[in-house]
C-alpha cells in the first residue's frame, strides 16, 4: 500500500510538473509573441522612415507647387493654341503644327552642325542676353534634342567609315 501511495505521489508530481511547465511556457510565450509582432511592426516603420528625412514635408510642398505651376503653364499654352487655331480646320491646324515642328528640328540640326553642345549653347545664350529667363526653356529643349538624337547616333555606332585603301597584299 505504501508503494502505491508513493507511486501515486510520484505520478501526481510528474503530471503537475509537466502541466505546470506547459502552463509556464504558455504564459511566457504569449507576451513574447506580442513582443515579436510589435518588433516586426516597429522594424517595418523604421524601414519606412529610412527612405525619408525631416524635410519630406517641404519637398512634398515644393513638388506639389511645381505640379500646379506646370498645370497653369499648360492651360496658358492651351489658351494660346486655341487663339491660334480659332476658325481653322483640323487639317490646317495639323499643317501648321507640322511646319512648326519641321522648322524647329531643322534649327536644332543647324545648331549641332555649328558645333554647339548643351553647355556651349547655354553659355552662348547667356553672353547674348544676360539674365534672360526664357533662355532656360530653349536650353532644356536643345538638351532634350541632344540627348535624343545626337547621343543616339554615337551609341548606335553610325559613323562615317573611311574608305579602305587596298594594300598590295590584298590584290
From Swiss-Prot:
A motif (RxLR-dEER) lies at residues 46-59. Induction: Expression is induced during host plant infection. The keyword Membrane does not apply. Keywords: Secreted, Signal, Virulence. It is found in: Secreted; Host cell. Residues 1-23 form the signal peptide. It comes from the Eukaryota. GO terms for cellular component: extracellular region; host cell. Effector that is involved in host plant infection. Contributes to virulence during the early infection stage, by inhibiting plant defense responses induced by both PAMP-triggered immunity (PTI) and effector-triggered immunity (ETI). Belongs to the RxLR effector family. The RxLR-dEER motif acts to carry the protein into the host cell cytoplasm through binding to cell surface phosphatidylinositol-3-phosphate. This is RxLR effector protein CRE7. It comes from Phytophthora infestans (strain T30-4).
